[in-house]
Amino acid sequence: MRTALLEVGLEELPASEFYNILEQLETRTRELLKANRIQCDSIEVFVGSRRFGVLLRGLPEKQEGFVEEKKGPPLNVAYDSKGAPTRALEGFLRKNNATFEDIIEKDGYVYISRKIEGKAVEEVLPEVFEDLVMGMSFKKPMRWGTGEYEYVRPVHWIVAMLDDRVLNLTLFGLRASHVSYGKRYHSGALKINTPEEYYEVLKSGYVMASHEERKKSVLKQLEDFERTYGMKVERDEALIAEIVAMTEYPRILVGQFDQKYLELPEEIIVTAVKHHQRAFVAHKDGLTNFFVAFQDGPQSSENVVKGYERVINARLEDARYYFHKDLEMSLGEMNERLKGIVFQERLGTLYDKVERIVKISRKICGELKFPEDFTEKVLKVASLCKADIASKVVYEFPELQGVMGRIYALKEGMDEELAFAIEDHYSENPETVIGSVLGMADRLDTIVGNFAIGNIPTSSKDPYGLKGKADTVFRIVRKNEWDVSLEELLNFAASLVGFHLSNDLEEFFSSRFYQFLINEIGVSYDVARAVNHLWKKPLRGTLAAEALQNISERPEFQDLFVGFERVHNITKKHDSREFDGALFEKEEEKRLMNKFFEVKEKVLKALERLNYEEALQYLIELKPYIDEYFDNVFVMVNRDDLRMNRLGFLKNIDDLFMMIGDMSHLVKRT
């Protein structure tokens, strides 16, 4: 078996493209090998800050062969009445360079059928590698030189090998070779004799090509630090991923900032160290003044550590100044300053937005029938929930929006529960009821406001993150089990910005509810479609989806499905619900009517208690009565009064089912 290597060497990749490239390499390599009929024992992809590529192990000598079939003329055209080949058949064979031995007959036609041998793998791999490299997509590609080429970053070298031979491949005007390059300023050209030695050769040039190896190295160095210093470092996965993406030879650095800054709230210190310097803070019976960073390369680290310490101390000195200046103002005074900060063009200032949040929060509390004293607490927090945006610390560290609101509120003596809600309302999954009310109100205002001024997301663009905000609204409703009318809340929020519930807005929430049910509740696509019309009452829609999903996995699902299907199919074009039981002629009609009234009462009571599983069980009881009805009653009779009466009656049954879901969307389970 054979081994192949592709490495594309570029200028430094942006960290934001790292995992995009990694995912594409894994997916496209597998797809291209399959499309070219090349078996492979293992596919190893690698991405570094200056390179990416694949290592293929266990390749065959050649592609798999295949049988090619090409359709020719019909039999009655290919042969004359005596069975002799016609000129049409001869021309077909000549055109395809085939012989009579290649002919088969199938479905009344002549076909050429012949086995095509696979090409040698060294002939095919250059095409595979070219398709792989040139078929990748990037968020912001760039041009270089004369502008002839466009790619994620300028390409400087290509390595393409099969065993010890260089493949015939040219990309971006560069001919492939067996020469790679190590760490900039620390290593020159690196000759690769075979793909098998690739990783070790690059290590000699201070490059860990494997991102998995770099991650293991980072974690090992963090463990060594903890063991040596007796401290703990929080494993921030996002930060670790960023370090893995930005370094090719990560090496730990240990530094200290001035102890006087430990008087600052821990959140400020962590943000200054982690978010702004990509370093970890260390704990030992609380936060210490130690930090851990990673440099790229083997160079002496003393000057680098001093550089980190200088920058972090400067950032913390600024933060300390801003923090103490902020403490000279109350949250109420900060809130007044929101009058000078624009929220969005045509949607007013942040102060205007806060006023709308207060009003929407009151509406939500009213819908949920919260006690007045609790509502007053909600509104108190709502009126201050954006105040910290006017603070100096948040201006310098935007990541602390909400966090500083909580800290300043506590400094003013606000109850801890209320102070935490200021931070909590920013969460995509708020922990508190107050945070949930504010989070929902805030997001409804943002979504409706953007639709009002024409900022409508598309399938590919959502610059204001409205899809995620809608998902959070549904998440809040489900978590808190709030039986609210989203339609009513949207209409109210829209009225505050001179808007209305448009078709675009309805379709947006309907589509997000569908995705929410699939991605977060975990129901199947057909179940999500069945209840999607219930998005205006999202708790009920979610509970209906969960109940339908559960019953669809049980034997009685067939009874439910068939019962609905028989009623729904005959009534879907009928609108009237009017019927008169006195016009029923057959006992089967009367029995179904009596059972329907009995079941309807039970179903409505179950739905009032939000027990959709119980409601479905009651609906199943209708199945034998529905079967008996259709076996003995002809609905579409010639008499208009009887036909309309029967359809009106059945439409009532259909409506009862539809309160839980449109089961015509459900796929029959076997």
UniProtKB/Swiss-Prot annotation:
Q: Which GO terms describe its molecular function?
A: arginine-tRNA ligase activity; ATP binding; glycine-tRNA ligase activity
Q: Which InterPro entries match?
A: DALR_anticod-bd (IPR008909), Gly-tRNA-synth_bsu (IPR015944), Gly-tRNA-synth_heterodimer (IPR006194), tRNAsynth_Ia_anticodon-bd (IPR009080)
The main location is cytoplasm
What GO cellular component entries does it have? cytosol
Q: State the Pfam families in the record.
A: DALR_1, tRNA_synt_2f
Q: Which UniProt keywords apply?
A: Aminoacyl-tRNA synthetase, ATP-binding, Cytoplasm, Ligase, Nucleotide-binding, Protein biosynthesis
EC number assigned by the record: 6.1.1.14
What EC class is this?
ligase
Name residues in a coiled coil.
none
Q: Name one GO biological process term.
A: arginyl-tRNA aminoacylation
Reactions the enzyme catalyzes: tRNA(Gly) + glycine + ATP = glycyl-tRNA(Gly) + AMP + diphosphate
Cell compartment(s), UniProt: Cytoplasm
The subunit structure is: Tetramer of two alpha and two beta subunits.
The record's listing under NCBIfam families reads: glyS
Query: Which family does the UniProt entry place this protein in?
Result: Belongs to the class-II aminoacyl-tRNA synthetase family.
Query: Per its record, how is this protein called by name?
Result: Glycine--tRNA ligase beta subunit
Organism of origin is Thermotoga neapolitana (strain ATCC 49049 / DSM 4359 / NBRC 107923 / NS-E)
Gene from which this protein is expressed = glyS
